[in-house]
């Protein structure tokens, strides 16, 4: 009896072990994602990056079938949040919104991070810099303004953001590219486009570089006019405003942009799944209406295209930052 009992116990153990072995492939092959995702936003709540990130998270979770929790990781001029994305476990469960500043921070000596430290998923937003002047300005084209700066270096002042911000670099880069000197129009720092535009209307500065949308109310009121946009094509809502290339022949472009990325080394399956879901989100009526209603520019560049975009943006920003003495 004792021997029979031992054999029965052995048979039961073997059966359980076999069941475990058979169950293992099923567990290993479970479809991604199996649990909630985290989307890191490297800027504060209430801003444009936060707003677009939260909209994406809400729609993305419907496509992925798992919650996508937004976490704001702020500080260090964007370094804290961008670092958190890059150093997260590359398992496909932590992604984030990366912004144009990833191509600025390392040039400024704030971090060693570059776009190569991420798995690029998709670029979804692009707001080209516009050249805004007073409505009664004698300058009718971007070429007129550039010629005036060349003839009178240091006379005309620009504004639109803080020193070294994206709109400052847009103006400095355009002037540098045109041979007018990156500092041909001295920069007056402001706490954003809105106060810069008010200073423009008041006569304290002569030009403001910002997105055209940020100047739209003053343009509609007949107090400001936009001479050109530093983008690939004209803006749908401001089709009368030419591109810088159309206005001057220059290939210089500069824009604020946002995209979704994860840490380098993410599994291909997770990257492909998120990318496909994000494309559905981007094309949805809800997302398109949200972006257009708030004046955010729309662009779609997945994977490798986004990686190339980041490389080109980094190179352009580095050139300007070196020219104006902001690179470390």
Language-model features and meaning:
Residues 2-15:
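Bacterial N-terminal signal peptides that target proteins for export
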Residues 25-27:
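N-terminal signal peptide c-region/cleavage motif recognized by signal peptidases
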Residues 29-117, 155, 180-207, 298-301, ...:
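N-terminal (or domain-start) structured segment
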Residues 34-36, 268-328:
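An extracytoplasmic/periplasmic, membrane-proximal ligand-sensing/linker region
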Residues 57-61, 175, 219:
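Conserved hydrophobic residues forming the short capping helix/wall of the S-adenosyl-L-methionine
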Residues 84-93, 107-195, 244-246, 257-290:
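Hinge/capping helix and adjacent helix->loop/strand transition within the periplasmic-binding protein
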Residues 96-102, 106, 193, 210-215, ...:
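Beta->alpha turn/N-cap motifs
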Residues 126, 214-283, 312-315, 320:
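C-terminal lobe and pocket-closing loops
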